[in-house]
């Protein structure tokens, strides 16, 4: 775990590789319980079978907005326990977004005690008074904790920080060392790097890596929170092989590989159901049921209640058919 003072030096080398954002497997009536055995298997699969170097816990893909404080704490504890039993060096990233700063503080303090390496705070989701309000929120947490902090600049919050607002947070709070820029605005990430060059940036628009931004130092070598375990199996490591080429600056080979392997087409086929609900097409969602159905197609356990908790809806049959067909075309399943 990095403390606040050393966070930026630590982040430059520690935040590297594929960081898997874990889903939450539900069970019981209406998904009121968590299938802890299934969750443990998922962690072991990501860290052990796939050998990925980072985890991203209790964020949007995990449906944090539907979880109790107690559930979120336990999900982190189990992830730390299972991951470190396999690889003591695995980086555990805990997302502590909450409506109230006091709840975020409770989760951040718990993450610090439970062995998380870094905490990410998503841009506050309600009644946010712009960049100044976000800065106040971060300060409230930073003044009361001693752990590396990251920003999660997600459009699902309803407000996206500008590069200037994010850079001001970095300037004011020494613990802030990384950001997941989830709004697919590469021009803002480029400007943010100019304003705060010490910040490790993951730009979710992965085309910037093909443009040489990693070698230029604009973005970092870590996929801070993705679902890499849904894009490969231990037998077909297309996702890891592609990113290994990128990280080694073999960009032409990487692009050729993504095309020839079917990875590019697979990502296009899958992404629509992961992040878009047809009944609200202008909203960037994390459709838990879609991620979990994809996991089930690969044979991963998703609990006896494989849907999202409210207020999300059940995944339609069309989505299931298209997701399964995408996996078949990509060659990760036979049928």
Where are these regions (language model features)?
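Short, solvent-exposed alpha-helical surface patches in well-structured domains
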Residues: 41, 74, 168, 253-256, ...
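Conserved active-site and cofactor/substrate-binding residues in soluble primary-metabolism enzymes
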Residues: 34-37, 41, 70, 74, ...
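Hydrophobic transmembrane alpha-helix bundles
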Residues: 53-54, 91-102, 124-137, 157-166, ...
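Catalytic alpha/beta core domains of metabolic enzymes, predominantly
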Residues: 140-144, 155-273
